[in-house]
Amino acid sequence: MKRFIYIIAILSLASCSFLEEDPQGKLTTEGFFTNASDLDASLNSLYSVVATSQQQNNFVGTDFLHGDDISTHPASNKQSLREFDQYTVADNNAWMQTLWEQRFKVIKAANFIINNASRTPDVAQEDIDAAIAQAHYWRAFEYFYLVTTWGPVPVMLSEVIDYNAPLVSEEKIYELIISDLKTAEAGCPVTYSKAPYFQNGVNVAVSQAAVKATMAYVYMCMAGWPLNKTEYYEKAADKAWEVIQGTMDGTYYYELLTAFSDIHSMAHNRNNKELLLGIYYNRDRHPNAIPATDYLLEMAGGWGDTQGEIKFWKEFPEGPRKTATYFPKLMLNGTLQDWWYDTDPASREVVAPIFMKTVESDVRGAEYDYTSGKACPSNGEKTVQVIRFSQVLCWYAEAVGRSGKVTAEAVDALNRVRNRADGAVTDMYSTAMSPEELAEAAYNEHGWEVAGYYWSGFATRARDMFRMYRYKEHFEYRVANPLIEVAPGVFRKEAVPVTGSWNDSRMYAPYPYTDSAVNPSM
């Protein structure tokens, strides 16, 4: 326990800005990594820092609001969120600052292991390699977040802070990400053999399959904007297929859960075999602040941070997936209403569909009942779902299509996802599709699979739109903000106004002022 506290102290020294550390306060790593307990403590600490970085939405980010699936409140205390929803982010955006600093806290924790763990004595080399591999994964994960949110950023590969670190280009950062992921792929086990890395029949720590899946999506992003190196689509397809084939030959245990409603259920919260990578929480020891964030202020206990965009909801195919994604009805003033309900004259500030993936019951372990009218707890323990197997199936199909091909395997992968979404074997996709049709179908299916779910900050709908350079199209749609018929004779539109004209600077967030004021390169 003392070792764990000591390493937490080392890794928590970063101030509000990662560039504002006092160099006189730098601690030496000498005296650590002297035995197996130190190695375990360093990993436990890394995962604690990772969990903290995802435990509330001002840590995990706000760039997800660029997506066409999700919006925010037009007033209240949501200015930091609205700026992202409107593509007009200021460099003093308070939430962006925490988003930025959390990424570098994880990077610092990962660097601590990468640069020091190899000297641990009396530990099997396999265990050392696995620890270092996991650290490389999380460093890659955070640099992926940084490069897709800010573009060129400083690169820190040690615990020493360089106050004059130059900005590194997107291409070079992607090279670092792939290098880190290749190290992780070589060192992360297929299945862990002991707790806490393996619990309830699933990997809790980063596994080989999770790394391969991550590489597949990173390659897809490298094939898209801004690098536009389309040859990477074939690499993405190959890497996604390695995961899929591994589930077919028994190398990996991952599978699609039978019903979409199972995915975010409490029954599968800690033993979800569709989940390639999750971040786990406990209400008593390390809770998250997720349950109340994403439903309306006027619902019991809601924080009203996000709601669904109307056009996306309208185009979302009906079926069990849609039913499990959005509240079927909203409890408003003690009465269940359709989301488009309003008083006469109109009085509701936000009239929009509401996502239901992150809510939790006030009774621990019970499934949430949207008809009860009871508030969600402020402290939650739903697992943050970083990558699911259904996403890998979509990525495979899209990457095959964007490579100019249509294969039976890609079509089958996409039908597996859609059949579950429909709750029946519809097999709506076929090899008669063109490559472009296959790619767009997979892109859409992935969007519907992850709609409104931004907690890992990895392959969100916004990230898909970023790599396909579709922010501009959505920005112009939001400027127009047309009325949409959501029920016979009932028309609604977005509550948050978007104005101005497009330029590509809106693709990225500005660097936080607190850091750009310190580093002249920013």
Role assignments for model-derived ranges:
Residues 40-54, 76-150, 163-175, 181-196, ...:
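Conserved, well-structured interaction surfaces
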Residues 16-66, 97, 112, 518-522:
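Acidic, glycine-rich segments characteristic of secretory precursors and extracytoplasmic regions
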Residues 30, 56-74, 189-209, 220-298, ...:
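Short, surface-exposed recognition loops and adjoining beta-strand edges that mediate ligand/DNA contacts
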Residues 3, 13-37, 140, 177, ...:
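Bacterial Sec-dependent N-terminal signal peptides
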Residues 147-149, 154, 192, 221-228, ...:
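Short coil/turn linking the two alpha-helices of tandem helical-hairpin repeats
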